[in-house]
């Protein structure tokens, strides 16, 4: 099957081969989008959908206005409807400009889609884009589902976002443009290897292609296999989850704990996402799962984030929304530590535990695997810290010795490990440690 036949088949599968359908085509004037527009124009009149061209001038390059002028002239000659939008320099952020530009661009596409009652937005992502994205995400790390890559089709605005050129390589697009005399513009910023994607595009991918010229196909095959496996996993988790929740949606600890260990995290993650309508990373989920698997104490609370907490009682775990408290009050339950994140634990204190030295005053501290999960909580009667030489000191005595007023003592927070041992009386004193398996940096910021 030729690439053009694949293109036509994909449009047919999306039910777009009809003059009664309207599609929005995102056109930048680069070779990818100009070929996409040309392919649509080549469709037989009886099958060709109504085409609305959407173009965003980001005003990031001097060449941008020339490209916009050319596209305006081209659409007039071809009798195509053109909608143009300007992302003016005054709206450009000082940092994160690429992400902000993408957000503006897709906001425009959604608006054009609604105004023209279009069924789909078509973009010109291709096989090389797919490989570049795959390698970038592989290098950055994260959830394995991210390696499934750019989806051929997904819900978007009032219809779908479709990428019909994902099976085309960049070379195929260039060859098609040359054969069909398609005029396009080269974005000079695509040559800037200071940008991560451009380094991968110009250095990494060509080198890998010398190892195996079938790189694009092999990555696409891996992504399809991964998609199939993740779909099967999702179906299995749905079945298992139905066996371990109550009619009210609570997680039954014994039944969940009886699942094979490799399924407990996946089932817990899906349950929590359904309860909160939020997504969580595996690093965030692992301590929650460890807390849920403990049998003591029988009744316990654990803060997930600013909006949700977990409550375990009578053999079940519930996800409960946190009621807003007054600014000067602090939570009376535990707050789970998020590694490498600042966390506000009182009205005036923000703390963090970092694996690298932060840009504020910090205290190096030894941790072990057994310490996790760590939590912040108000100090309690009986809490004590380890002193140099092996002795201990009650937190209550420490605060009295430091002449902390009684009304302020209640606001003092401590960092405790999984065994309940105090590692840090925040703002006052650290427990003494000289060994461990991991060095972290404990930091505190005061706010008025």
Swiss-Prot record:
Gene Ontology MF terms in the entry: ATP binding; tRNA(Ile)-lysidine synthase activity
Residues that hold ATP according to the record: 28-33
Record-linked PANTHER family: TRNA(ILE)-LYSIDINE SYNTHASE-RELATED
Keyword tRNA processing: yes
Domain of life: Bacteria
Cited function: Ligates lysine onto the cytidine present at position 34 of the AUA codon-specific tRNA(Ile) that contains the anticodon CAU, in an ATP-dependent manner. Cytidine is converted to lysidine, thus changing the amino acid specificity of the tRNA from methionine to isoleucine.
Reaction(s) this enzyme catalyzes, per UniProt: cytidine(34) in tRNA(Ile2) + L-lysine + ATP = lysidine(34) in tRNA(Ile2) + AMP + diphosphate + H(+)
Family assignment from sequence similarity: Belongs to the tRNA(Ile)-lysidine synthase family.
Subcellular location: Cytoplasm
Pfam families with a match to the protein in the record: ATP_bind_3, TilS_C
Name of the protein: tRNA(Ile)-lysidine synthase
Domain remarks in the Swiss-Prot or TrEMBL record: The N-terminal region contains the highly conserved SGGXDS motif, predicted to be a P-loop motif involved in ATP binding.
Protein EC: 6.3.4.19
Organism name: Lactiplantibacillus plantarum (strain ATCC BAA-793 / NCIMB 8826 / WCFS1)
GO cellular component terms, semicolon-separated: cytoplasm
Signal sequence, renumbered to the chain: none
One GO term (biological process): tRNA modification
CDD domains linked to this entry: TilS_N (cd01992)
Keywords recorded for this protein, A-Z: ATP-binding, Cytoplasm, Ligase, Nucleotide-binding, tRNA processing
Gene3D superfamilies to which the protein is assigned, alphabetical: HUPs
Top enzyme category: ligase
């Amino acid at each position: 099957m030729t690439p053009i036949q694949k293109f036509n088949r994909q449009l047919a599968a999306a039910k777009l081969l009809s003059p009664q359908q309207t599609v929005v085509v995102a056109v930048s004037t680069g070779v990818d989008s100009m070929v996409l527009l040309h392919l649509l124009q080549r469709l037989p009149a009886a099958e060709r959908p109504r085409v609305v061209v959407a173009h965003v001038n980001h005003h990031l390059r001097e060449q941008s206005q020339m490209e916009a002028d050319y596209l305006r002239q081209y659409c007039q000659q071809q009798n195509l409807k053109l909608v143009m939008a300007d992302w003016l320099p005054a709206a450009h952020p000082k940092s994160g400009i690429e992400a902000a530009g993408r957000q503006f661009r897709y906001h425009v596409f959604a608006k054009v889609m609604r105004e023209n009652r279009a069924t789909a937005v078509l973009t010109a992502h291709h096989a090389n884009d797919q490989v570049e994205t795959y390698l970038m995400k592989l290098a950055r790390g994260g959830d394995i589902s991210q390696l499934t890559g750019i989806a051929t089709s997904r819900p978007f605005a009032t219809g779908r976002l479709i990428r019909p050129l994902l099976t085309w390589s960049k070379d195929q697009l260039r060859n098609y443009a040359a054969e069909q005399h398609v005029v396009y513009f080269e974005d000079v910023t695509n040559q800037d290897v200071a940008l991560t994607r451009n380094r991968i595009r110009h250095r990494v991918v060509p080198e890998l292609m010398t190892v195996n010229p079938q790189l694009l196909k092999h990555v696409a095959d891996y992504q399809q296999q991964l998609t199939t496996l993740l779909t099967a996993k999702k179906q299995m988790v749905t079945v298992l989850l139905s066996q371990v929740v109550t009619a009210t949606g609570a997680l039954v600890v014994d039944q969940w704990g009886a699942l094979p260990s490799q399924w407990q995290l996946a089932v817990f993650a899906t349950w929590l996402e359904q309860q909160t309508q939020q997504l969580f990373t595996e690093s965030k989920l692992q301590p929650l799962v460890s807390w849920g698997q403990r049998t003591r104490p029988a009744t316990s609370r654990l803060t997930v984030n600013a909006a949700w907490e977990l409550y375990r009682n009578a053999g079940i775990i519930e996800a409960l929304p946190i009621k807003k408290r007054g600014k000067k009050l602090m939570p009376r339950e535990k707050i789970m530590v998020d590694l490498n994140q600042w966390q506000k634990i009182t009205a005036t204190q923000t703390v963090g535990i970092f694996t690298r030295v932060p840009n504020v005053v910090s205290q190096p501290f030894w941790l072990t695997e057994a310490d996790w999960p760590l939590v912040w909580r108000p100090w309690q009667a009986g809490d004590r810290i380890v002193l140099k030489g092996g002795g201990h000191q009650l937190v209550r005595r420490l605060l009295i010795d430091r002449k902390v007023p009684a009304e302020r003592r209640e606001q003092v927070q401590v960092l405790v490990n999984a065994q309940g041992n105090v590692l840090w009386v925040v703002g006052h004193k650290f427990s003494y440690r000289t060994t461990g398996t991991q060095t972290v940096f404990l930091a505190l910021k005061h706010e008025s």
